[in-house]
C-alpha cells in the first residue's frame, strides 16, 4: 500500500521509484535522515550497520511512513562479511542502483595521544570499510548495470585538529572517490562525495559531555552563523544520486556554510539571526523525524 510520506523533500515525488539504494550507517544521524528521504522518493532502501536495534527502528519508521526498507547487520570492516552482505542484497533485489557510503565514526584525540590501535580503528571504519562496500557493490552489481556511489567524507580541508585520524581517512576517501570515478566510468558508474561541515546530527551525542561548550561555540566559526541540518546534507546526497547529476562524477560537494573559507584577518563576523532567515540561506529541515542532539537541548 502506498501512502503519502511526510518528509518534505525538495525533489519530485517518485524520483527514485523502483531503485534499490544501500545506505551504510543508516540507523542514525545523517544516514537515517537520508534513508527517509530516499524512501519518500520511491526507493527501496537497504539499511546497513552494526546495531540491529537502530536499523530495525529506522526500517519501521520508513514502513510506517509508507516507504520500503530492509536492513542487514554487517561490520563493514570485515571483508568476507561485506562480500556476503552485498551478495544477499543482489540476490534479494536483483541489483543495486545506488550506494550511500555513510558509515563512519571517530573520537577526539590529539595526534600525540592517539594509539596505533585507535588510529587503525578509525581508518578501518572511515576508509577501508567504505572501499570494501563500494568495491563489492561495483563487482557484484554496478559493473553489469551501472550505478551511482556517494561517499560521505567530512570538512577536513586544511587540517582537522583533535581528529587527525579521521582527517587522514576522509582525505583518503576523497582520493578513492576521484580514482573510482575514473576507473568505473567505462561501466556507467558515477562516484562522488559529500563533505558535511558542522551538522546538528545525533553523531554529536557520541562526544563526552565536557565537549558540549566547545561544540556549541563552533557555530561562530561558520560564516552563515549556524549549524547545518541533516536534511540539508541529505538533499546534496539525493542530488548526486539523481538523473540531474548524470554528468557529475569525481567531485566533492561541500555542505558547510563556507566554513573552510574563514580566514584570519578577514571580517570574522558571522551572519546575524535576522540574516540567517533570508530565503537563500535560511535553514532547511524537511526531516519530519529529526532529533535535536542532546548538546543543543
Residue ranges, per PLM feature:
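Substrate-binding pocket helix/loop in short-chain dehydrogenase/reductase
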Residues: 110-111, 118-123, 218
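Catalytic loop of short-chain dehydrogenase/reductase
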Residues: 150-172, 177-186
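Conserved glycine-rich cofactor-binding loop
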Residues: 27-29
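Alpha-helical segment proximal to the catalytic Tyr-Lys
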Residues: 139, 182-186, 246
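Short C-terminal tail/terminal secondary-structure segment
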Residues: 2-13, 238, 249-297
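Short, small/polar-rich loop/turn modules that mediate ligand/substrate recognition or access, typified
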Residues: 100, 185, 190, 248-250
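C-terminal substrate-recognition "lid" of short-chain dehydrogenase/reductases
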Residues: 131, 226-255, 260-261
